Each structure stands twice: as structure tokens, then as C-alpha cells.
């Protein structure tokens, strides 16, 4: 679980990094990426949590909706890759319920951090240069140990 000093971008990256494991669990179980019932339930839960901590429920739900959309993009890309290259699917897929519990904990941490930093944390940076390191970190997170298309799956 993230520490109390984890930054908002760090928490977003941690949540996004779990997307690959979620995709593997869903793909291995024959479940679709999209789960609109769970998504709506999570957005409703976030609205309640936001009210409890004094955060605008619409801001919180919009923020989580963006996190869900980013995760689904990663999952769809992996589903496409694994459909074409089934040998690249990680063996022994993770338990989706365990991953969802981890995501739920990250959601609470994200909301707490968002409430602590305020909505200005969601404002675009003044300079594109401010995005360089977070983007490099996100790229490394999403490509770490990822096989090249048609690769063996034995990344560095």
C-alpha cells in the first residue's frame, strides 16, 4: 500500500502499472476488458468517499473515470497482442479479486491525495518540460518486461 507521502502522479502510475496484471487475469479467465457494471459501482463509491473527505464528488468521479479509461486502453492493447501471440501471455495469471482490492486501496489513496493537494493538482503544467520525467516514468512502467511483438516474453 502506498505511503502517506506518495505523490498524486506516483499513485496514478501505480494504478496504471496494475493494468497489465488485470488484463492477464481477465484474458486468462475469458472475461472482457469492459465491465460497465463494476465501473458504475466504483464511480458511485468514489462519489460517496469524496463527500466524506470534503472533495467535490464530480471532480473525484471524473478523475477516477480518467484512470479507468487509461487502464482499459492498456488492457485492450494487451488483449490484441495476446490474441495474436498467445505464447506471450504471462503464466499463472493473478487473481482478479486480489488486484481489485489493491485498486480499491489505491483509489482511496488517490482521493486522499487529491483532497490534500486540491484540484490545482489536476491543472496542466505551465511548461511541457514539466511532463518529461512523469512521461518517461510512465513509459518505463508500462514497457518494463514487456516482450516485443512476437517476442519470447522474457524481458530484462
Residue ranges and their predicted role:
Residues 36-46, 63-71:
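Acidic helix-start/capping segments at beta-turn-to-alpha-helix junctions
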Residues 19, 50, 71, 75, ...:
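A structural signal for well-ordered alpha-helices, especially hydrophobic packing surfaces
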Residues 1-32:
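Immediate post-signal-peptide N-terminus of mature secreted/exported proteins
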Residues 25-30, 78, 85, 117, ...:
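Secondary-structure edge/capping motif, primarily at the C-terminal ends of alpha-helices
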Residues 53-82:
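Mid-length scaffold segments of soluble, non-membrane domains
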Residues 5-8, 28-36, 48-53, 89, ...:
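Second-shell loop/turn segments in exported
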Residues 114-156:
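Glycine-rich, aromatic-bearing surface loops/beta-hairpins
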Residues 90-118:
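Acidic/histidine-rich alpha-helical segments that form the ligand environment
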